[in-house]
Amino acid sequence: MGKLVKHCHTSLHSELVILFYAKNRFCISIDHLRPLKSHRTHGHYCLLNFSLRENKNYLIIVYLPIEGFSANHMCISHGTSFNIK
């Protein structure tokens, strides 16, 4: 148990990223992520200015893309799942 229920469902024209999860674990699609400019490592992306909102069966990440990096950016690896704090 604890595996992902479903991979992320995203919309290219929306600011909402819906993440289906199970056992408090989820993964993020790279559709709304931008590659890290400060690293040359492949597979690392950054989600800027985000906030988590919990709903019945999914999480919604609301974000505002900006140029450069802010204090509340989150770097992840493609396909990586992690715990919700």
Curated annotation (Swiss-Prot):
Main location group: cytoplasm
One GO CC annotation: cytosol
Keywords: Cytoplasm, Meiosis, Nucleus
GO biological process: meiotic cell cycle
The UniProt record lists the keyword tRNA-binding: no
Origin: domain of life: Eukaryota
Cellular compartment(s): Cytoplasm; Nucleus
General function of this protein: Has a role in meiosis.
The name this protein goes by in its record: Meiotically up-regulated gene 144 protein
Encoding gene per record: mug144
